[in-house]
């Protein structure tokens, strides 16, 4: 069964691309009966405030017609930023050689949180270098991941 995020991704992907942006990912967060829907968009040269406004208007119109969210919700549209969340294996592949932070659904070696250099991706597994040791994590066990911004 598809998640709300997956349904929204499928529903909104083409509309966002028609506006010249990539739908990087979607996060839905429920607090009580209220939901926040966050769309992360990206494009070559960076995302502008106008891009976010255009996508927000288009997506709002689609959500008003399709009505996929039963409760009240707030729509937020933004760039993924420097510490961008990673949603798909192809997105992880773009950041091989960089530091990422990962939060797991089920602990591995009694840890849910891992941070290290993304070494490689094989099938549905990612390999991080953590304290000079390889740590292999199953993609399906990743609840949340993001690039660690270096300043």
From Swiss-Prot:
GO terms for biological process: ribosomal small subunit assembly; translation. Transmembrane segments: none annotated. The keyword Iron does not apply. One of its GO terms (cellular component) is cytosol. The keyword Oxidoreductase does not apply. Its main location: cytoplasm. Belongs to the RimP family. This is Ribosome maturation factor RimP. It comes from Haemophilus influenzae (strain ATCC 51907 / DSM 11121 / KW20 / Rd).
């Amino acid at each position: 069964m598809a998640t709300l995020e997956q349904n929204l991704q499928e529903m909104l992907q083409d509309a966002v691309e028609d506006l010249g942006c990539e739908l990087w990912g979607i996060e839905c967060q429920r607090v009580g009966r209220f939901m926040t829907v966050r769309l992360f968009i990206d494009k070559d040269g960076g995302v502008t405030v106008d891009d976010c406004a255009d996508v927000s208007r288009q997506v709002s119109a689609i959500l008003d017609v399709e009505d996929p969210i039963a409760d009240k919700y707030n729509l937020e549209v933004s760039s993924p930023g420097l510490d961008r969340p990673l949603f798909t294996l192809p997105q992880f592949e773009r950041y091989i050689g960089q530091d990422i932070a990962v939060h797991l659904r089920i602990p591995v070696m009694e840890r849910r949180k891992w941070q290290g250099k993304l070494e490689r991706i094989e099938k549905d597994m990612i390999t991080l270098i953590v304290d000079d040791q390889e740590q292999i994590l199953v993609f399906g066990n990743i609840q949340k991941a993001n690039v660690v911004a270096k300043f």
